[in-house]
Amino acid sequence: MHPLRGSICLNCLSKWSPWRRMSTRNTTEPPLSKKQQKRKMKEETITQYAGDNSKRADRVYAWGCASTGAIGIPSYLKPEKGQHPIYTVRQPARVKFMDRANLKVTKVGCGYGFTVYVTISFRGNRLYGTGINTDSQIGYHEFPRNTGRVLDYVIEPTLIDLPLDHRDTTNITQVACGRGHTLILTDKEGVFTLGNNAYGQCGRPIVEGEVYGQNPRVNKMKDIPDNIAKIVCGHDHSFLLTTDGEVYSCGLGCDGQTGLGHYRTTSQPTKIKGGIEGVKITQIASTGDCVLALSEEGDVFAWGNSEYNQLSIVTEQTQINIPKYLPLKHCGKIIKAASAGSKCAIVNTKGELFVWGYGILGKGPKLESATEPEMIPPPLFGCNELEPDVSVIDVVCGLHHFVALTNNGSVYTWGKDKHGCLGLGIQRDQYFPLKVSIPAETHSIQCGVDHTVVLCKSFC
Protein backbone atom coordinates (compact mmCIF):
# COMPACT_ATOMS: atom_id res chain seq x y z
CA MET A 1 0.00 0.00 0.00
CA HIS A 2 1.18 3.50 -0.77
CA PRO A 3 2.32 5.21 2.50
CA LEU A 4 0.20 8.28 1.72
CA ARG A 5 -2.92 6.42 0.68
CA GLY A 6 -5.98 6.88 2.88
CA SER A 7 -8.46 9.57 3.94
CA ILE A 8 -7.35 13.17 3.52
CA CYS A 9 -9.09 16.02 5.34
CA LEU A 10 -10.96 18.17 2.83
CA ASN A 11 -10.07 21.23 4.89
CA CYS A 12 -6.43 20.66 3.95
CA LEU A 13 -7.05 20.94 0.20
CA SER A 14 -5.93 24.55 0.10
CA LYS A 15 -4.28 26.13 -2.89
CA TRP A 16 -0.74 25.77 -1.55
CA SER A 17 -1.15 22.47 0.29
CA PRO A 18 1.20 19.61 -0.70
CA TRP A 19 -1.69 17.27 0.07
CA ARG A 20 -3.63 18.94 -2.74
CA ARG A 21 -0.81 18.36 -5.21
CA MET A 22 -0.51 14.71 -4.21
CA SER A 23 -4.25 14.11 -4.39
CA THR A 24 -4.66 15.69 -7.84
CA ARG A 25 -1.55 14.08 -9.30
CA ASN A 26 -3.01 10.56 -9.20
CA THR A 27 -6.60 11.29 -10.26
CA THR A 28 -8.36 12.44 -13.37
CA GLU A 29 -11.09 14.25 -11.42
CA PRO A 30 -10.88 18.04 -11.41
CA PRO A 31 -10.24 19.72 -8.04
CA LEU A 32 -13.32 20.64 -6.01
CA SER A 33 -14.34 24.22 -5.55
CA LYS A 34 -14.79 25.58 -2.03
CA LYS A 35 -18.56 25.37 -2.41
CA GLN A 36 -18.32 21.74 -3.53
CA GLN A 37 -15.98 20.96 -0.64
CA LYS A 38 -18.45 22.37 1.89
CA ARG A 39 -21.33 20.45 0.30
CA LYS A 40 -19.37 17.20 0.41
CA MET A 41 -18.34 17.74 4.03
CA LYS A 42 -21.97 18.35 4.94
CA GLU A 43 -23.03 15.13 3.20
CA GLU A 44 -20.35 13.16 5.05
CA THR A 45 -21.17 14.65 8.45
CA ILE A 46 -22.33 12.06 10.96
CA THR A 47 -24.74 13.30 13.63
CA GLN A 48 -25.18 11.23 16.77
CA TYR A 49 -28.45 11.59 18.66
CA ALA A 50 -29.09 10.58 22.26
CA GLY A 51 -31.64 7.81 22.56
CA ASP A 52 -34.81 8.02 24.61
CA ASN A 53 -33.28 5.72 27.22
CA SER A 54 -29.93 7.50 27.48
CA LYS A 55 -28.98 8.42 31.04
CA ARG A 56 -27.91 11.98 31.81
CA ALA A 57 -24.77 12.14 33.91
CA ASP A 58 -24.25 14.15 37.08
CA ARG A 59 -21.76 17.00 36.87
CA VAL A 60 -20.14 19.32 39.42
CA TYR A 61 -18.72 22.67 38.33
CA ALA A 62 -16.90 25.24 40.44
CA TRP A 63 -15.19 28.59 39.95
CA GLY A 64 -13.65 31.42 41.93
CA CYS A 65 -10.70 31.45 44.34
CA ALA A 66 -8.59 28.33 43.83
CA SER A 67 -5.65 29.24 46.08
CA THR A 68 -7.46 27.87 49.16
CA GLY A 69 -8.22 24.50 47.57
CA ALA A 70 -11.97 25.15 47.69
CA ILE A 71 -12.35 24.40 43.96
CA GLY A 72 -11.10 20.86 44.58
CA ILE A 73 -8.93 20.45 41.48
CA PRO A 74 -5.41 19.55 42.73
CA SER A 75 -3.59 20.26 39.45
CA TYR A 76 -4.32 23.96 39.94
CA LEU A 77 -2.06 24.12 43.00
CA LYS A 78 0.26 21.19 42.21
CA PRO A 79 0.72 21.51 38.44
CA GLU A 80 2.69 19.13 36.28
CA LYS A 81 6.22 20.00 35.25
CA GLY A 82 6.27 23.00 32.95
CA GLN A 83 2.85 24.22 34.05
CA HIS A 84 2.06 27.18 36.31
CA PRO A 85 -0.23 27.16 39.36
CA ILE A 86 -3.73 28.56 38.91
CA TYR A 87 -5.01 30.64 41.81
CA THR A 88 -8.12 32.15 40.21
CA VAL A 89 -10.68 30.25 38.12
CA ARG A 90 -12.82 32.74 36.18
CA GLN A 91 -14.91 30.20 34.27
CA PRO A 92 -16.75 27.04 35.38
CA ALA A 93 -14.35 24.14 35.84
CA ARG A 94 -15.55 20.57 36.10
CA VAL A 95 -14.66 18.84 39.37
CA LYS A 96 -13.81 15.42 37.98
CA PHE A 97 -12.93 13.82 41.32
CA MET A 98 -16.57 12.82 41.75
CA ASP A 99 -16.53 10.93 38.44
CA ARG A 100 -13.26 9.15 39.19
CA ALA A 101 -14.50 8.10 42.63
CA ASN A 102 -17.94 7.16 41.25
CA LEU A 103 -19.69 9.56 43.65
CA LYS A 104 -23.06 11.23 43.22
CA VAL A 105 -23.21 14.61 44.98
CA THR A 106 -26.58 15.30 46.63
CA LYS A 107 -25.82 18.43 48.69
CA VAL A 108 -23.09 21.10 48.85
CA GLY A 109 -22.01 23.58 51.50
CA CYS A 110 -19.66 26.48 50.73
CA GLY A 111 -17.79 28.30 53.49
CA TYR A 112 -15.04 30.87 53.55
CA GLY A 113 -12.50 29.15 51.34
CA PHE A 114 -13.75 25.59 51.75
CA THR A 115 -16.37 23.28 50.26
CA VAL A 116 -18.15 20.26 51.74
CA TYR A 117 -20.00 17.65 49.66
CA VAL A 118 -22.63 15.11 50.69
CA THR A 119 -22.27 12.09 48.40
CA ILE A 120 -23.82 8.72 47.64
CA SER A 121 -21.98 5.71 46.25
CA PHE A 122 -22.04 1.93 46.55
CA ARG A 123 -20.24 2.46 49.87
CA GLY A 124 -23.18 4.47 51.17
CA ASN A 125 -23.67 8.07 52.27
CA ARG A 126 -20.37 9.91 52.80
CA LEU A 127 -19.04 13.43 53.44
CA TYR A 128 -16.09 14.99 51.58
CA GLY A 129 -14.33 18.31 52.15
CA THR A 130 -11.75 20.44 50.35
CA GLY A 131 -10.12 23.82 51.00
CA ILE A 132 -9.04 25.75 54.09
CA ASN A 133 -8.82 23.58 57.20
CA THR A 134 -7.00 25.84 59.67
CA ASP A 135 -9.86 25.46 62.19
CA SER A 136 -10.53 21.78 61.39
CA GLN A 137 -13.73 22.87 59.67
CA ILE A 138 -13.43 19.99 57.21
CA GLY A 139 -12.11 17.44 59.69
CA TYR A 140 -8.80 15.96 60.77
CA HIS A 141 -6.57 14.94 57.87
CA GLU A 142 -3.15 13.44 58.61
CA PHE A 143 -0.95 12.99 55.57
CA PRO A 144 1.02 10.84 55.20
CA ARG A 145 -0.65 8.66 57.81
CA ASN A 146 1.01 8.18 61.20
CA THR A 147 3.43 11.05 60.59
CA GLY A 148 1.78 13.68 62.76
CA ARG A 149 1.58 16.01 59.76
CA VAL A 150 -1.96 17.39 59.76
CA LEU A 151 -3.15 19.34 56.74
CA ASP A 152 -4.26 22.97 57.13
CA TYR A 153 -5.18 23.04 53.45
CA VAL A 154 -6.79 20.22 51.47
CA ILE A 155 -6.67 20.63 47.68
CA GLU A 156 -8.92 17.75 46.63
CA PRO A 157 -12.18 16.38 48.10
CA THR A 158 -11.20 14.13 51.01
CA LEU A 159 -13.34 11.89 53.18
CA ILE A 160 -14.55 13.44 56.45
CA ASP A 161 -15.02 10.79 59.11
CA LEU A 162 -18.06 11.21 61.36
CA PRO A 163 -18.55 9.29 64.64
CA LEU A 164 -21.84 7.72 63.56
CA ASP A 165 -23.32 4.94 65.68
CA HIS A 166 -25.08 3.35 62.71
CA ARG A 167 -22.89 4.14 59.73
CA ASP A 168 -24.70 1.85 57.31
CA THR A 169 -28.22 3.12 58.00
CA THR A 170 -27.73 6.79 58.96
CA ASN A 171 -27.92 9.23 56.06
CA ILE A 172 -26.45 12.72 55.83
CA THR A 173 -29.26 14.95 54.57
CA GLN A 174 -27.67 18.42 54.54
CA VAL A 175 -24.48 20.37 55.20
CA ALA A 176 -23.98 24.08 55.97
CA CYS A 177 -20.77 26.11 56.24
CA GLY A 178 -19.90 29.42 57.91
CA ARG A 179 -16.69 31.40 58.18
CA GLY A 180 -14.81 28.66 60.01
CA HIS A 181 -17.38 26.06 61.08
CA THR A 182 -19.49 23.33 59.51
CA LEU A 183 -22.85 21.81 60.46
CA ILE A 184 -23.90 18.33 59.31
CA LEU A 185 -27.52 17.15 59.54
CA THR A 186 -28.38 13.44 59.63
CA ASP A 187 -31.73 11.70 59.46
CA LYS A 188 -31.28 9.52 62.55
CA GLU A 189 -28.39 10.81 64.67
CA GLY A 190 -28.95 14.54 64.96
CA VAL A 191 -26.57 17.38 64.09
CA PHE A 192 -22.77 17.19 64.08
CA THR A 193 -20.44 20.21 64.05
CA LEU A 194 -16.82 20.84 63.06
CA GLY A 195 -14.47 23.79 63.34
CA ASN A 196 -14.30 27.09 65.18
CA ASN A 197 -16.49 27.49 68.28
CA ALA A 198 -15.12 30.79 69.60
CA TYR A 199 -18.65 32.23 69.80
CA GLY A 200 -20.59 29.04 70.48
CA GLN A 201 -21.59 28.65 66.83
CA CYS A 202 -21.03 24.89 67.02
CA GLY A 203 -23.64 24.57 69.73
CA ARG A 204 -21.31 23.53 72.55
CA PRO A 205 -19.75 25.36 75.52
CA ILE A 206 -16.99 27.85 74.67
CA VAL A 207 -13.56 26.78 75.92
CA GLU A 208 -11.15 29.65 76.59
CA GLY A 209 -7.89 29.22 74.71
CA GLU A 210 -9.12 26.21 72.73
CA VAL A 211 -6.97 25.43 69.71
CA TYR A 212 -9.17 24.58 66.75
CA GLY A 213 -6.49 23.80 64.19
CA GLN A 214 -5.40 20.16 63.84
CA ASN A 215 -8.19 19.17 66.22
CA PRO A 216 -9.81 15.75 65.64
CA ARG A 217 -12.90 16.64 67.68
CA VAL A 218 -16.31 16.19 66.07
CA ASN A 219 -19.13 17.55 68.22
CA LYS A 220 -22.71 16.31 68.36
CA MET A 221 -25.25 18.94 69.39
CA LYS A 222 -27.06 18.17 72.63
CA ASP A 223 -30.44 19.23 73.99
CA ILE A 224 -31.93 20.09 70.61
CA PRO A 225 -35.26 18.98 69.09
CA ASP A 226 -35.39 15.61 67.35
CA ASN A 227 -37.18 16.99 64.31
CA ILE A 228 -34.52 19.23 62.77
CA ALA A 229 -35.28 19.62 59.06
CA LYS A 230 -32.76 22.26 57.91
CA ILE A 231 -29.50 23.82 59.08
CA VAL A 232 -28.05 27.23 58.17
CA CYS A 233 -24.69 28.85 58.92
CA GLY A 234 -24.14 32.59 59.02
CA HIS A 235 -20.84 34.37 59.55
CA ASP A 236 -20.20 33.06 63.09
CA HIS A 237 -23.69 31.90 64.02
CA SER A 238 -25.96 28.95 63.26
CA PHE A 239 -29.65 28.16 62.85
CA LEU A 240 -31.67 24.97 63.22
CA LEU A 241 -35.10 24.79 61.58
CA THR A 242 -37.59 22.13 62.72
CA THR A 243 -40.31 20.39 60.73
CA ASP A 244 -42.82 22.44 62.76
CA GLY A 245 -41.27 25.67 61.50
CA GLU A 246 -39.56 26.64 64.76
CA VAL A 247 -36.11 28.23 64.62
CA TYR A 248 -33.23 27.72 67.07
CA SER A 249 -29.99 29.73 67.01
CA CYS A 250 -26.56 29.92 68.63
CA GLY A 251 -23.29 31.78 68.14
CA LEU A 252 -22.22 35.41 67.87
CA GLY A 253 -24.98 37.91 68.62
CA CYS A 254 -23.24 41.32 68.57
CA ASP A 255 -25.49 42.53 65.72
CA GLY A 256 -28.59 40.76 66.99
CA GLN A 257 -28.15 38.05 64.36
CA THR A 258 -29.16 35.24 66.73
CA GLY A 259 -32.58 36.91 67.15
CA LEU A 260 -32.76 36.02 70.84
CA GLY A 261 -33.49 39.51 72.17
CA HIS A 262 -29.91 40.32 73.23
CA TYR A 263 -26.46 41.00 71.75
CA ARG A 264 -24.49 38.31 73.60
CA THR A 265 -22.96 35.07 72.40
CA THR A 266 -24.98 31.89 72.91
CA SER A 267 -23.49 28.39 72.90
CA GLN A 268 -26.71 26.45 73.45
CA PRO A 269 -29.20 26.44 70.55
CA THR A 270 -32.17 28.44 71.80
CA LYS A 271 -35.63 28.91 70.33
CA ILE A 272 -36.23 32.27 68.62
CA LYS A 273 -39.48 34.04 69.43
CA GLY A 274 -40.45 37.62 68.59
CA GLY A 275 -42.32 38.12 65.33
CA ILE A 276 -41.93 34.50 64.21
CA GLU A 277 -43.42 32.93 67.33
CA GLY A 278 -46.32 30.75 66.22
CA VAL A 279 -45.37 31.21 62.54
CA LYS A 280 -44.22 28.23 60.49
CA ILE A 281 -40.86 29.20 59.01
CA THR A 282 -39.70 27.33 55.89
CA GLN A 283 -36.38 29.01 55.05
CA ILE A 284 -33.59 30.96 56.78
CA ALA A 285 -31.09 33.05 54.78
CA SER A 286 -27.94 34.51 56.35
CA THR A 287 -24.51 34.69 54.76
CA GLY A 288 -23.39 37.72 56.77
CA ASP A 289 -25.04 39.18 59.90
CA CYS A 290 -28.43 40.13 58.45
CA VAL A 291 -31.06 37.38 58.60
CA LEU A 292 -34.17 36.80 56.48
CA ALA A 293 -36.80 34.18 57.34
CA LEU A 294 -39.64 33.04 55.07
CA SER A 295 -42.94 31.68 56.34
CA GLU A 296 -45.14 29.03 54.81
CA GLU A 297 -47.52 31.81 53.72
CA GLY A 298 -44.73 33.59 51.84
CA ASP A 299 -44.19 36.39 54.37
CA VAL A 300 -40.73 37.76 55.18
CA PHE A 301 -39.29 38.33 58.66
CA ALA A 302 -35.90 39.83 59.44
CA TRP A 303 -33.41 40.64 62.20
CA GLY A 304 -29.72 41.34 62.73
CA ASN A 305 -27.53 43.92 61.01
CA SER A 306 -29.17 46.87 59.24
CA GLU A 307 -26.20 49.20 58.79
CA TYR A 308 -26.91 49.35 55.05
CA ASN A 309 -30.68 49.90 55.37
CA GLN A 310 -31.55 46.25 54.81
CA LEU A 311 -34.24 46.55 57.52
CA SER A 312 -35.00 50.27 57.29
CA ILE A 313 -38.59 49.45 56.28
CA VAL A 314 -39.35 48.63 59.92
CA THR A 315 -36.63 50.39 61.94
CA GLU A 316 -34.10 53.21 61.93
CA GLN A 317 -31.78 51.25 64.22
CA THR A 318 -28.64 49.64 62.81
CA GLN A 319 -29.25 46.36 64.65
CA ILE A 320 -32.37 44.39 65.57
CA ASN A 321 -32.10 41.54 68.05
CA ILE A 322 -35.59 40.11 67.60
CA PRO A 323 -37.49 39.06 64.44
CA LYS A 324 -39.75 41.65 62.82
CA TYR A 325 -42.25 41.27 60.01
CA LEU A 326 -41.30 43.04 56.76
CA PRO A 327 -44.37 44.42 54.92
CA LEU A 328 -43.49 43.50 51.32
CA LYS A 329 -46.97 42.88 49.94
CA HIS A 330 -46.12 44.47 46.59
CA CYS A 331 -43.60 41.67 46.02
CA GLY A 332 -46.16 38.86 46.17
CA LYS A 333 -45.69 35.50 47.88
CA ILE A 334 -41.99 34.94 48.55
CA ILE A 335 -40.48 31.47 48.10
CA LYS A 336 -36.70 32.12 48.18
CA ALA A 337 -34.41 34.60 49.94
CA ALA A 338 -30.71 35.48 50.13
CA SER A 339 -28.97 37.83 52.55
CA ALA A 340 -25.44 39.00 51.73
CA GLY A 341 -23.10 41.30 53.63
CA SER A 342 -24.95 44.53 52.80
CA LYS A 343 -27.83 43.57 50.50
CA CYS A 344 -30.75 41.16 50.18
CA ALA A 345 -32.69 39.39 47.44
CA ILE A 346 -36.02 37.57 47.31
CA VAL A 347 -37.90 35.54 44.67
CA ASN A 348 -41.69 35.27 44.46
CA THR A 349 -43.98 32.56 43.06
CA LYS A 350 -44.01 34.29 39.66
CA GLY A 351 -40.25 33.91 39.37
CA GLU A 352 -39.58 37.63 39.81
CA LEU A 353 -36.46 38.67 41.71
CA PHE A 354 -36.24 41.74 43.97
CA VAL A 355 -33.15 43.34 45.54
CA TRP A 356 -32.42 46.02 48.12
CA GLY A 357 -29.64 47.22 50.43
CA TYR A 358 -26.29 48.69 49.42
CA GLY A 359 -23.73 47.72 46.79
CA ILE A 360 -24.03 46.22 43.33
CA LEU A 361 -27.71 45.29 43.37
CA GLY A 362 -28.19 44.16 39.78
CA LYS A 363 -30.04 47.06 38.14
CA GLY A 364 -27.03 48.80 36.63
CA PRO A 365 -24.23 51.03 37.96
CA LYS A 366 -26.55 53.91 38.87
CA LEU A 367 -28.44 51.95 41.54
CA GLU A 368 -26.20 51.25 44.50
CA SER A 369 -28.65 51.80 47.35
CA ALA A 370 -32.31 50.91 47.89
CA THR A 371 -34.31 50.86 51.11
CA GLU A 372 -37.17 48.85 49.59
CA PRO A 373 -37.14 45.86 47.22
CA GLU A 374 -36.79 46.72 43.54
CA MET A 375 -37.49 44.17 40.82
CA ILE A 376 -34.75 43.25 38.36
CA PRO A 377 -36.33 43.17 34.87
CA PRO A 378 -37.17 39.54 33.91
CA PRO A 379 -35.55 39.85 30.43
CA LEU A 380 -32.18 40.01 32.20
CA PHE A 381 -32.81 36.39 33.24
CA GLY A 382 -33.69 35.23 29.72
CA CYS A 383 -37.45 35.83 29.74
CA ASN A 384 -38.39 37.14 26.28
CA GLU A 385 -40.77 36.62 23.35
CA LEU A 386 -39.02 33.42 22.35
CA GLU A 387 -38.95 32.03 25.90
CA PRO A 388 -41.78 33.74 27.79
CA ASP A 389 -42.00 31.06 30.49
CA VAL A 390 -38.45 31.47 31.84
CA SER A 391 -38.43 32.47 35.51
CA VAL A 392 -36.10 32.54 38.52
CA ILE A 393 -36.55 29.65 40.94
CA ASP A 394 -33.63 30.15 43.36
CA VAL A 395 -31.14 32.76 44.52
CA VAL A 396 -28.08 32.45 46.78
CA CYS A 397 -25.26 34.81 47.65
CA GLY A 398 -21.77 35.28 48.95
CA LEU A 399 -20.91 38.45 50.82
CA HIS A 400 -20.70 40.59 47.68
CA HIS A 401 -22.25 38.62 44.81
CA PHE A 402 -25.52 36.94 43.87
CA VAL A 403 -26.19 33.75 41.91
CA ALA A 404 -29.65 33.02 40.46
CA LEU A 405 -31.03 29.83 38.93
CA THR A 406 -33.83 29.77 36.35
CA ASN A 407 -36.35 27.04 35.60
CA ASN A 408 -34.54 26.08 32.40
CA GLY A 409 -31.31 25.28 34.27
CA SER A 410 -29.44 28.50 33.47
CA VAL A 411 -27.25 30.34 35.98
CA TYR A 412 -26.88 34.13 36.23
CA THR A 413 -24.42 36.06 38.41
CA TRP A 414 -23.78 39.68 39.35
CA GLY A 415 -21.92 41.70 41.97
CA LYS A 416 -18.26 42.06 42.87
CA ASP A 417 -16.04 39.65 40.97
CA LYS A 418 -13.80 38.78 43.90
CA HIS A 419 -11.30 36.13 42.75
CA GLY A 420 -13.49 35.24 39.77
CA CYS A 421 -16.50 34.19 41.86
CA LEU A 422 -18.91 35.35 39.11
CA GLY A 423 -17.60 32.79 36.61
CA LEU A 424 -18.02 35.11 33.63
CA GLY A 425 -14.48 34.71 32.29
CA ILE A 426 -13.58 38.38 32.71
CA GLN A 427 -12.01 40.31 35.56
CA ARG A 428 -14.56 42.98 36.35
CA ASP A 429 -17.57 43.65 38.55
CA GLN A 430 -20.95 42.89 36.99
CA TYR A 431 -23.77 45.44 37.51
CA PHE A 432 -26.65 43.37 36.14
CA PRO A 433 -27.32 39.61 35.84
CA LEU A 434 -25.27 37.88 33.16
CA LYS A 435 -25.55 34.24 32.14
CA VAL A 436 -22.71 31.90 33.08
CA SER A 437 -21.59 29.54 30.31
CA ILE A 438 -21.97 26.02 31.74
CA PRO A 439 -22.05 22.98 29.41
CA ALA A 440 -24.80 21.29 31.44
CA GLU A 441 -28.22 21.92 32.98
CA THR A 442 -27.93 23.25 36.53
CA HIS A 443 -30.31 22.19 39.30
CA SER A 444 -28.55 23.39 42.47
CA ILE A 445 -26.40 26.44 43.32
CA GLN A 446 -24.24 27.35 46.33
CA CYS A 447 -21.91 30.25 47.18
CA GLY A 448 -18.94 30.81 49.41
CA VAL A 449 -17.44 34.21 50.09
CA ASP A 450 -15.28 34.02 46.95
CA HIS A 451 -16.22 30.84 45.12
CA THR A 452 -19.31 29.22 43.63
CA VAL A 453 -20.32 25.57 43.16
CA VAL A 454 -23.18 24.22 41.03
CA LEU A 455 -24.65 20.73 40.62
CA CYS A 456 -25.74 19.86 37.09
CA LYS A 457 -27.00 17.19 34.72
CA SER A 458 -25.35 16.65 31.36
CA PHE A 459 -27.48 17.59 28.37
CA CYS A 460 -27.40 14.01 27.08
Where does each model-flagged region fall?
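Solenoidal tandem-repeat scaffolds enriched in leucines and small polar residues
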Residues: 175-325, 337
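Conserved core positions of repeat-based scaffolds
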Residues: 62, 114-117, 129, 181-184, ...
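Blade-level signature of beta-propeller repeat domains, shared across WD40, Kelch, NHL, RCC1
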Residues: 410, 416, 424-460
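N-terminal mitochondrial targeting presequence
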Residues: 1-29
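Loop/turn-rich, solvent-exposed surfaces of beta-rich toroidal or solenoidal domains
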Residues: 341-343, 352, 360, 377, ...
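Residue-level signature of beta-propeller blades and closely related beta-rich strand-turn architectures
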Residues: 66, 77, 121-122, 133, ...
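Beta-propeller domains
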Residues: 56-95, 120-153, 205-210
